[in-house]
Amino acid sequence: MTASRPKALQTFCLLLPLLVWMVDRSLCYKPVIVVHGLFDSSANFKNLLQYINESHPGTNVTVLDLFDNKESLQPLWKQVQGFKEAIYPIMQNAGRDGVHLLCYSQGGLICRGLLQTMPDHNVDTFISLSSPQMGQYGDTDYLRYLFPTYVKSNLYRLCYTQMGQTFSICNFWNDPHHHGIYVNVSDFLAPLNSERPEPNATDWKKNFLRLRKMVLIGGPDDGVITPWESSHFGFYDENETVLEMKYQMVYQDDTFGLRSMDYRGAITVYGVPGVVHTMWHSNQTVFKNCIEKWLT
């Protein structure tokens, strides 16, 4: 009886480092908060949840079930407020360790709204997955479904009105041929980018720069985000020639902290061909190559 005790103790001592390593691995993963896109819901992210659980077991992942499906057409500032109320307790529970934000499509703009308006957020890494960060200007199936009597060239007549700005898609509709109207009328993207005088611009920039890392993911075969380079903060000029992020006014003037983030090496950009818009969050190769390493 007494002879077996040293052996048991020896076995326990041998296993202890492995047990500690296993516990440490699950404890070191920051909580992940996922925000869905237009006409989406939490039900569409089962594959992503599986990928995270397989690669980082024990990670606390929350796919927020707010503004689902047609409710995702609600004005973006309203959605920002709703998501803020849901996210804040998760951030508080995470404490100093912080959280990661993984935001898809329209959700990427909602997350920017959160980041810029929350002075005490503790987001470590913001992953923007095929999100129109510089806006949208293109004839897509979504546009034809929502506004069947309009095309991209005349949608500004609806979007740049008080009624139009009650639709989320109009909040980031960025017509390069009517830029002046966009700047004056846009309720969301123009003030978020500080493209017009904004009384909160200094505070919003400071809040955004609390981020440690921003990851921008998009690709040429997306088929919805137009131009697709908007997912990388690129956009059309008045001739519909795409100018990359570094040639955008918001970067050159550092209106909300984009250039500052880039200068400190805090932005990583992935351009992935062969992925259509609705498959970004289900594509395992995208997860392995562009997302997994940032969720530690």
Swiss-Prot record:
Pfam families with a match to the protein in the record: Palm_thioest (PF02089)
Keywords: Disulfide bond, Glycoprotein, Hydrolase, Lysosome, Signal
Cystine residue pairs: 103-111, 159-170
Family annotation (SUPFAM superfamilies): alpha/beta-Hydrolases
Residues making up the signal peptide according to the UniProt record: 1-28
GO cellular component, one term: lysosome
Family: Belongs to the palmitoyl-protein thioesterase family.
Catalysed reaction equations from the record: hexadecanoyl-CoA + H2O = hexadecanoate + CoA + H(+); S-hexadecanoyl-N-acetylcysteamine + H2O = N-acetylcysteamine + hexadecanoate + H(+)
Protein name: Lysosomal thioesterase PPT2-A
Glycosylation sites: 53, 60, 184, 200, 239, 283
Lineage of the species this protein comes from: Eukaryota, Metazoa, Chordata, Craniata, Vertebrata
The enzyme's E.C. designation: 3.1.2.2
